[in-house]
Amino acid sequence: MTNGRVFLRMRLPCAGAALAVLLALGAGTATAQPVSPAETLLFETDHLARLKAPATLVYSFRKESNVEPGFKDEVRLELAKVNGKLSATLHFLTGEHKQEIPALEEAHGNPVLLGFLEHDIAEMKRLTGGSTSYFRKRIRMALAEGAQVTLQPITYQGKTVQAQAVRIQPYLNDPMHARFEKYLRKTYTFVLSEQVPGGLYQLQSSLGKPETVRTATKPVDAPVIDETLTLISVTPKQP
């Protein structure tokens, strides 16, 4: 039986090397341990199976921080049928914040998740000077070994539906904690539900208290960075 992490990498041969590495999330350890429930939810679930193309999903994006100015933006996922296959084009943020993500010719998992993680990893590199491969490894290990999966009700377009929340703290037990001391308690939360279009309701990375933002008269030593991406609409409306 093919391990899921290797399987995901094989399904997207045209997505680009960086995206394939992120999708694999540890294919090198595929024979060492089974796929965890968190990995199954995030990377082995066909989030787009219930969507009818063409369709466009829109997500809001909000960043709050005391390190640098926050901002609000949006993420758009455009789906189309090409030669009987579902293709996906992801526009992850706009302007100076735009993250380039390769188009997928045969999409199964929701690429918004990949865009969010690639964005976060790039930000960690920018803020700390660390290696993107190291941050990917920490996230991979946390999903494989230390993720918490809980039931969580959510409200989408006025309706309460059941969801599952996956939470990880990749740097809490980091052997290189001395270098990334300020980021030890950074928490990632992924909220998924089969009852919302695209399967992903909300993605969040949080460090510190998001209500504490930078001001000219109130400097804060400990970094506070909160980034939240939330599904707001799909067009045309899905059955």
Give residue ranges: language-model regions.
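N-terminal secretory signal peptides that target proteins for export/translocation
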Residues: M1-R11
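Extracellular/luminal beta-rich ligand-recognition
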Residues: H119-G129, S133
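Bacterial N-terminal signal peptides
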Residues: A15-G26
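Surface-exposed, glycine/proline- and aromatic-rich loop segments on solvent-exposed faces
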Residues: L90-F92, K98-E123
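Sec/Tat signal peptide C-region and signal peptidase I cleavage site
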Residues: G28-A32
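Acidic, serine/threonine-rich low-complexity disordered tracts
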Residues: Q33-L104, G130-P239
